[in-house]
Amino acid sequence: MTLPNLVIAGAPKCGTSSLYRWLADHPEACGSKVKETFYLMDEGHPLLRRGSNYHARGLEGYGEFFGPCAARARVVFEATTHYLYQRTPLEVLSHLPRLPQIVFVLRKPSERVYSSFRYSQNNLANVRADLSFARFVELSKANGRGGADWEALAGASAFVLRNDVAYSRYSEHIAPWVARFGRGRVHVLLFEDLRSDPRAFMKGLAERVGIDASFYDAYGFPPKNETFGVRYPSLHRGVRRLNELVPSGGLKGAIRKLYLKAQAGGAGGARKPEDARALEELERDFRPFNRRLADELGLDLSAWE
């Protein structure tokens, strides 16, 4: 049975889809059959896959996510970003016979929250079009006191968005992982570095995990899973429902490219003045948590200033 020796365990909306693709393209690495297995999610979590999870099938089922490439790979990995906030992966992975390396990619917290909101509202079309980011922040900070009906406001994204501000207090969530795996096996990287210089970012990670860094000298770094604004939100919601019924294939991929080109650049991508004010408010709230993160892990977070 093959199990991962590296897990990208967080955080959501921090460039991990691109990271997964770039690492999986390396000849000495083997990525899971799907980027996010969600296999080790806690019981009762809405992202837990029914019938395909640790609680139902144990480690044997987990091994099925890693294909034939695992036999020759130096790095076998998956990338479920919500593991950062779960107890099950912390317990299971820390008791494997061979302790895996853990990778976290973190983004300026206020910007991560903003990206998550926009992705849910635009790409996923789950959030009501009339819910502004500023109002979302206000409801999030009310911590349930405002009586918000999150399911009505955000549909399938309700659970994640309701917790997104708390999810961005990284120091609270990373501390248990460092305690279990040790600082030397927990690699904390920055989204800002990934975006500004992906080549240096990947070469640095390759050196850390013991694969040939020179592979990335001539690599093209294709982007993956980027957030975009949509011109026609109601149409996008209908198209997403239809997409689930259409089988995968070359024609579907070609149509998708044309559709996204037509939709891209909508108003959802613009940053409104009230959004900017809400972001400033979030930044003030996050500062003490960022300082704690920098102090405890020895990180340079000047890119977040």
What kind of feature is each model-predicted range?
Residues M1-L84, H95-V105, P109-A156:
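PAPS-dependent sulfotransferase catalytic core
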Residues H45-R50, T80, F159-S168, L190-E192, ...:
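Active-site rim elements
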Residues L48-R50, L131-A158, P233-G265:
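Charged, glycine/proline-rich intrinsically disordered loops and linkers
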Residues A56-A70, N126-A218:
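PAPS-dependent sulfotransferase catalytic domain
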Residues Y62-F65, P89, Y170-I174, F201, ...:
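Alpha-helical packing segments of well-folded alpha/beta enzyme cores
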Residues Y85-L90, P198:
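Short, well-ordered alpha-helical microsegments
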Residues A175-E280, R284, L299-E305:
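The conserved 3'-phosphoadenosine-5'-phosphosulfate
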